[in-house]
């Protein structure tokens, strides 16, 4: 089982905090570096080059991080990927698709699913679902022989590890915070009342939108930069809070009212990491950075007192 997270950045110096956080959370939960990787590209690269690089990965699952500046390129890329990797599950996530996941699935038939809202836990559980699917050989026909071969080659330690991982894996309809295309012949239970039928009657497809996932504590978000190299040549994105208390009609951030803050103890420790690594530019991506004066001033004070002149 192999999954690839894909970031399509505006420029090389930019980075993708969303992809980093999903990767770091799943790795901390026990997913190995052989099972999950992330790849970063830019919208200025030739699409054929990106497609070639992703094709070489031969992933079972591929997830794209979707924003306003890359959504059209990602749709085109994902459509082409489906042609050359028809057995690969393709999932979208990010602010450009999260707010209307059912419609995104209806309009893009090559998609397997869309993550709705925060993705750390949902992505991990979806990844575990696909691991179980492979272990049980509940696969698309073209992969059955390959799966049998892989299973027979596993060592006893690998089998034991997989058994432990599969103990509490959920089915898709039990995973909160996702939308997915219903497989024919499969009966849904908890998610049944969230079904949306496709407008295209000839396709006879149904979209399942599961229950919203409760917001996680920001202290449970894994700091993604500890093991990363070459931070001196990139713009680093960092968040100390999520959510927005305001209701601006033009902004997607107004959808999530639950403002949460990362504990100041963690924030200071992570700011010190950036200072020690001599990162030249850190951009705070909090929706409303100054909505809590005490929180904001503590951050400024720490930076002022520990300035390293970079």
Sequence positions of predicted segments:
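Alpha-helical scaffolding segments of alpha/beta enzyme cores, especially the outer helices
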Residues: 21, 76-83, 125, 269, ...
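A short, charged/proline- and glycine-enriched loop
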Residues: 1-2, 234
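Glycine-rich beta-alpha loop elements in corrinoid/cobalamin-binding modules
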Residues: 25, 34-211
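Short catalytic helix/loop segments, enriched in acidic residues and glycine
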Residues: 19-27
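Nucleotide-activated donor-dependent transferases that construct or modify glycoconjugates
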Residues: 2-11
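Short, glycine/serine-rich, charged loops/turns that create anion-binding
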Residues: 10, 97, 288-289
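Short N-terminal binding/cap micro-motifs at the start of the first secondary-structure element
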Residues: 12-18
């Amino acid at each position: 089982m192999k999954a690839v997270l894909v970031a399509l950045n505006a420029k090389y110096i930019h980075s993708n905090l969303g992809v980093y956080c999903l990767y770091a959370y799943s790795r901390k939960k026990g997913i190995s570096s052989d099972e999950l990787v992330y790849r970063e590209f830019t919208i200025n690269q030739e699409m054929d080059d990106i497609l070639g690089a992703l094709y070489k990965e031969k992933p079972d699952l591929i997830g794209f991080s979707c924003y306003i500046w890359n959504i059209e390129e990602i749709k085109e890329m994902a459509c082409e990927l489906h042609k050359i990797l028809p057995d690969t599950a393709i999932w979208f996530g990010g602010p450009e698709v999260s707010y209307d996941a059912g419609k995104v699935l209806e309009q893009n038939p090559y998609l397997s699913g869309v993550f709705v809202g925060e993705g750390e836990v949902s992505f991990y559980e979806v990844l575990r679902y696909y691991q179980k699917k492979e272990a049980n050989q509940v696969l698309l026909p073209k992969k059955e022989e390959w799966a049998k071969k892989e299973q027979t080659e596993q060592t006893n330690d690998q089998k034991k590890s997989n058994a432990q991982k599969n103990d509490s894996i959920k089915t898709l309809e039990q995973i909160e915070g996702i939308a997915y295309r219903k497989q024919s012949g499969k009966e849904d239970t908890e998610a049944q009342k969230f079904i949306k039928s496709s407008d295209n009657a000839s396709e006879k497809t149904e979209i399942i939108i599961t229950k919203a996932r409760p917001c996680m504590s920001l202290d449970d978000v894994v700091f993604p930069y500890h093991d990363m190299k070459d931070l001196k040549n990139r713009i680093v994105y960092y968040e100390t809070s999520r959510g927005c208390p305001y209701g601006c009609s033009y902004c997607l951030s107004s959808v999530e009212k639950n403002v949460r803050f990362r504990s100041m103890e963690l924030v200071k420790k992570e700011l010190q990491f950036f200072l020690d690594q001599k990162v030249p530019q850190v951009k705070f991506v909090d929706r409303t950075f100054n909505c809590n004066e005490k929180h904001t001033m503590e951050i400024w004070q720490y930076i002022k007192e520990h300035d390293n002149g970079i």
